[in-house]
Design a protein with these regions (language model features):
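Cyclic nucleotide-binding regulatory module and flanking cytosolic helices
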Residues: 13, 208-267, 316
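Acyl-donor binding region in acyl/amide transferases
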Residues: 76-175
């Protein structure tokens, strides 16, 4: 079935996008972002007024996906409007006209994992490059970090909590850093926009320097032996056995890890939030986390999680909402597995 990506240039299409966000974010995922309007059954916020909104339509004209792009030069006060994202850090190097922020990437379930995502990024990336954008900022839940890293995005700062969304990982893409796009085997390299402008500003080198402290491991971007060396021992050292790995030899375990990525976390990062609809499975590779839960108006510490410990398994296996907070106590590295792992 053929798809097309359109720029939403009428109030009707923009309102259809707001409604699609509500269907996916509230009705499907069970989230409750502050911008949700439950009477109109749509999600619209202050960034939409000046944003480029992209719509993916099937051959019948039905809306199946969307993405939003904001140029910081179009925002009245980007530092305030995009708080708590680290906008001030970017503005120290880049003029507002060279920075974009992409958000509200959503696809209906039937269209995930197919051509729709690639078409959205192709159009958005091309428009951004043509407009003079040098870096794009986004934020992703842990289970989507792997996807963005394969596109060429890099982690560059600690994770953060967003109201109504939960723990998010800010990520940056240097649009003209062809060396990193090539190293990431990014599909963006196939697009003409990636070849039109040289990185004469040295954005790739700057990105590499600030991203080094937050570099994790993505099984698709490193040699298999390097990835296994980082995660294999921890999978067998913890007191809590991972049922999905029970009885498997090393070769079989490696096959099952083909959706894994390793995330570096800082103290006080809230990896899992009580009541949040998340479906990732986490394995502690390094460091310590603490499990907290609200009970009768009091906050109780339930457990400490150390190397080899597993958390998030109930959400991973289908429970709709997380039953407790999991907060990093020390610097950590955690292996994240998504449901594609199954």
């Amino acid at each position: 079935m053929s798809l097309q990506v359109l720029l939403a240039d009428t109030p009707e299409i923009r309102e259809a996008i707001y409604a699609l966000r509500y269907v996916i974010y509230v009705e499907e995922m069970g989230k409750s972002p502050p911008a949700a309007d439950h009477q109109r059954r749509w999600i619209r916020d202050g960034l939409d007024a000046t944003a480029l909104l992209y719509a993916v339509q099937d051959e019948a004209g039905a809306l199946v996906g969307t993405m939003r792009l904001n140029r910081l030069s179009d925002l009245r006060d980007p530092i305030t409007q995009l708080t708590p994202l680290p906008i001030a850090t970017l503005l120290e190097r880049f003029p507002p006209a060279a920075i974009s922020h992409t958000s509200r990437l959503m696809l209906l379930p039937a269209w995930r994992g197919g051509a729709a995502l690639g078409l959205l990024f192709k159009r958005c990336y091309g428009d951004a490059a043509e407009a003079g954008i040098r870096v794009d900022l986004c934020h992703a839940k842990p289970g989507l970090v792997e996807l963005y890293e394969q596109l060429g995005y890099r982690r560059f700062c600690p994770g953060l909590d967003l109201e109504g969304v939960g723990y998010q990982v800010p990520m940056l893409l240097a649009l003209h850093d062809r060396t990193h796009l090539r190293d990431s085997r990014s599909p963006l390299l196939r697009f003409q926009a990636s070849r039109q402008v040289e990185d004469r500003w040295g954005d790739g080198g700057w990105m590499a320097s600030i991203a080094e402290s937050y570099r994790g491991l993505n099984h698709r971007l490193v040699e298999p032996d390097e990835f296994w060396a980082a995660v294999g021992d921890a999978l067998h050292e913890g007191e809590q056995e991972i049922p999905l790995f029970r009885g498997l030899n090393e070769e079989q375990s490696r096959v099952l890890l083909k959706t894994g990525t390793v995330l570096s976390c800082q103290p006080r990062d809230r990896l899992v939030g009580e009541g949040e609809p998340q479906h990732e499975l986490f394995v502690v590779l390094e460091g310590v986390a603490e499990v907290w839960r609200q009970h009768d108006g009091h906050r109780l510490s339930l457990a400490l999680l150390e190397r080899g410990a597993v958390f998030g398994e109930m959400g991973f296996l289908g429970r709709s909402r997380r039953s407790a907070d999991v907060i990093a106590v020390t610097p950590m590295r955690v292996l994240i597995l998504t449901q594609a792992f199954l």
